[in-house]
Regions:
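Conserved hydrophobic/aromatic beta-strand scaffold that supports enzyme active sites
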Residues: 18, 398-400
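Short hydrophobic/aromatic beta-strand or adjacent loop that forms the aromatic wall/cage
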Residues: 128-130, 394-398
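S-adenosylmethionine
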Residues: 312-395, 402
Length: 403
C-alpha cells in the first residue's frame, strides 16, 4: 500500500479533489479542499497522466469536515456516499463549484451557481425511494466496492427512506449473487422488492401472472396532485421530493403555454408529460418521445385521459428525423447522463422552438450541450441546480435557453 502525504486543492467533477505529487495530478476522494492528508493510491500506473487515491488519514482537517453517517461508503468502501464527510451546506457549495467550473471550461460561460436543497430536506438522509443491491455468495445484501466487482456486505443504508428500512433487507439472507431492487414509492403505495426482476413475497418469488411489478408514485406540482404508474425496475427520480422539485422547476421554466405545442424528449413514464399536458390545455399538444418500451407502456396508462398527448416509441434522433412535429413552441428534454449531444441539438434547433428547457444530471454533459446550443442561437438564459442526491457528488440542473 503506497501512502502519499498531500495538500489538497480544489474540487473536481466526479467527487474528487485535486492534489499534486511531484508534478502529477492526483484525484483524491474522501477529502476537502485545504486539507493535508495521508492518501492511499488506488490507481497509479507509472506512465498514467494522473493517479487516483483515497484519503485514509486527515492530518489537517477542513472546518467543513464532519463524521460520515455512512462509514461503509468511506475510504475503500462502497460507492454512493462519497461526500458523507462533508457538512451538508458545504456539499451544496461543492456541487455549485463543479457546475460553475464545467460551464466555464466547456461552454466559456462565467455564471454564479446556487444549489438548492430539495423540498423538505433537513439532514441529507432518508431520501432514497429506490435502492439497488447485490448479494454475495453467502446471500448477504451489499454493494460493489468503488470501482470494483467485489460485493461488500452492508448492515444499513442510511440514505433510504423509512419504507425501505422497514423491509429489514439487511437483516435477512437472500439467494446468492442476485440483484435486489427495493422500492418505497411516495404517496402510500406498499413497498416492493424484486429479486433479479421477479417480485418477492415473504421468503420466495411471487410468480403469479398478476404479481405486482409496478408502483404508484405521487407528487404535487403547484396545487395539483399527479399520479404515475411506474415499473419498479424502471427509471424514476429517486429522491422522495425530486419529482416535485424538478417538475415545479420545469413548469416554471416553460411558463404559461395555453394552446401551445410542446415536445417532451426522453419522456420516460411521463413525469413532465402529464403536467405539460395541463399547461397547454385541451387545445394544445404534447409530443412525448421515449426509447424504452416499458416506460412508454407506463406513459400510455398515465396519460390515458389526456388526448392532447401523443406518445412515440423510439430513439430521440430517430423520431426527430420522422418530422413528428415541425415547429414546437417549447422543447423539454431530460437526457441520460451522457447528455443530448451534437446531433440531437442540431435536430432540435432546426425546429426553431421559442424555448428549450433542459434537465441534466451531469454537469459536464450539460456544459457541452450549453456550448452547442449557444453556438446555434440559443443562449443560456436561466439555470437552477438541485441537491437531489445528498452525500454524493451528483447534482440535477434545469437550464433554460431562448431563441
Amino acid at each position: 500500500m503506497t501512502l502519499l502525504e498531500l495538500t489538497v486543492g480544489p474540487v473536481a467533477h466526479g467527487g474528487h479533489c485535486v492534489a499534486r505529487h511531484e508534478g502529477r495530478v492526483v484525484f483524491v476522494r474522501h477529502t476537502l479542499p485545504g486539507e493535508r492528508v495521508l492518501a492511499r493510491l488506488t490507481e497509479a500506473e507509472p506512465d498514467a497522466r494522473f493517479w487516483r487515491a483515497d484519503a485514509v488519514e486527515v492530518l489537517e482537517p477542513s472546518p467543513d469536515r464532519v463524521p460520515s453517517p455512512w462509514p461503509e461508503a468511506g475510504p475503500g468502501g462502497v460507492g454512493g456516499g462519497e461526500l458523507g464527510h462533508v457538512a451538508l451546506a458545504a456539499q451544496r457549495r461543492w456541487k455549485a463549484t463543479v457546475v460553475a467550473e464545467q460551464l466555464h471550461r466547456l461552454a466559456r460561460l462565467d455564471r454564479e451557481v446556487v444549489v438548492e436543497a430539495a423540498p423538505g430536506e433537513t439532514d441529507g438522509l432518508g431520501w432514497r425511494t429506490r435502492i439497488e443491491l447485490t448479494t454475495d455468495d453467502a446471500g448477504r445484501p451489499g454493494m460493489h466496492r468503488y470501482r470494483s466487482e467485489e460485493v461488500v456486505p452492508l448492515s444499513a443504508m442510511p440514505l433510504a427512506v423509512s419504507g425501505i428500512v422497514d423491509l429489514d433487507i439487511f437483516g435477512r439472507r437472500w439467494p446468492a449473487a442476485v440483484r435486489l431492487t427495493a422500492v418505497a414509492p411516495v404517496g402510500g403505495d406498499r413497498p416492493l422488492v424484486l429479486v433479479d426482476g421477479v417480485p418477492w413475497s415473504g421468503d420466495g418469488p411471487d410468480r403469479r401472472p398478476n404479481a405486482r411489478t409496478s408502483v404508484r408514485e405521487r407528487a404535487v406540482l403547484a396545487t395539483t396532485e399527479y399520479s404515475w404508474r411506474v415499473a419498479a425496475a424502471g427509471f424514476w427520480q429517486v429522491h422522495r421530493t425530486g419529482p416535485t422539485a424538478l417538475g415545479t422547476a420545469v413548469l416554471d421554466a416553460v411558463g404559461p403555454r395555453d394552446g401551445a405545442t410542446v415536445l417532451d424528449l426522453y419522456a420516460g413514464a411521463g413525469l413532465f408529460t402529464l403536467p405539460l399536458a395541463d399547461v397547454v390545455g385541451p387545445s394544445g399538444r404534447v409530443v412525448a418521445v421515449e426509447g424504452d418500451p416499458g416506460a412508454v407502456r407506463d406513459a400510455r396508462r398515465n396519460a390515458h385521459d389526456r388526448p392532447q398527448v401523443e406518445l412515440h416509441l423510439g430513439g430521440v434522433t430517430e423520431v426527430l428525423g420522422q418530422d413528428v412535429v415541425a415547429h414546437p413552441d417549447v422543447v423539454v428534454l431530460d437526457p441520460p447522463r451522457v447528455g443530448a449531444g451534437r446531433e440531437v441539438v442540431e435536430r432540435l434547433v432546426a425546429m426553431r422552438p421559442e424555448r428549450v428547457v433542459y434537465v441534466a444530471c451531469d454537469p459536464a454533459a450539460l456544459a457541452r450541450d450549453v456550448a452547442y446550443l449557444g453556438q446555434r442561437g440559443y443562449p443560456l438564459t436561466g439555470l437552477r441546480a438541485f441537491d437531489l442526491f445528498p452525500m454524493t457528488h451528483h447534482v440535477e440542473c434545469v437550464a433554460t435557453f431562448d431563441r
